[in-house]
Amino acid sequence: MDVTRLLLATLLVFLCFFTADSHLPPEEKLRDDRSLRSNSSVNLLDFPSVSIVALNKKSKQISRKEAEKKRSSKKEASMKTVARPRTPLSAPCVATRNSCKPPAPACCDPCASCQCRFFRSACSCRVLSLNC
């Protein structure tokens, strides 16, 4: 009995390792520089060289001004957002955190929705988004 459990446990560990290993991307193992040149489909000389250029004071000032303009425009845009008007409450509705099984009317809060759990046996109105 213990031998069969040990065998099954070993088999389970092997299968877990095999599935995890099969989902990993294959690693390229190149032995030397010659195989790198022969196996490489992209020649490194095809890419242009990178040149590093120092910025002068004028270009730094211009880039700072552009960054400040972007920051101020983002602040103005965030201040311009206005909360949308809420719809008037209808009389037959379900309050937040109360039961709202499907034959019941909709939730009173426009940001709330009816969420059911346990195969639609326990349903309640819940607010999902705080920014609504």
Swiss-Prot record:
Gene3D superfamilies: Agouti domain. GO terms for cellular component: extracellular space. Its main location: secreted. One of its GO terms (molecular function) is neuropeptide hormone activity. Residues 62-85 are annotated as: Disordered. Glycans are attached at N39. Coiled coil: none annotated. Keywords: Disulfide bond, Glycoprotein, Knottin, Secreted, Signal. GO terms for biological process: hormone-mediated signaling pathway; melanin biosynthetic process; melanosome organization. Residues 63-78 have a biased composition (Basic and acidic residues). It comes from the Eukaryota. Disulfide bonds join C93-C108, C100-C114, C107-C125, C111-C132, C116-C123. Residues 93-132 form the Agouti domain. It is found in: Secreted. Residues 1-22 form the signal peptide. The presence of a 'disulfide through disulfide knot' structurally defines this protein as a knottin. Involved in the regulation of melanogenesis. The binding of ASP to MC1R precludes alpha-MSH initiated signaling and thus blocks production of cAMP, leading to a down-regulation of eumelanogenesis (brown/black pigment) and thus increasing synthesis of pheomelanin (yellow/red pigment). This is Agouti-signaling protein. It comes from Pongo pygmaeus (Bornean orangutan). The gene is ASIP.
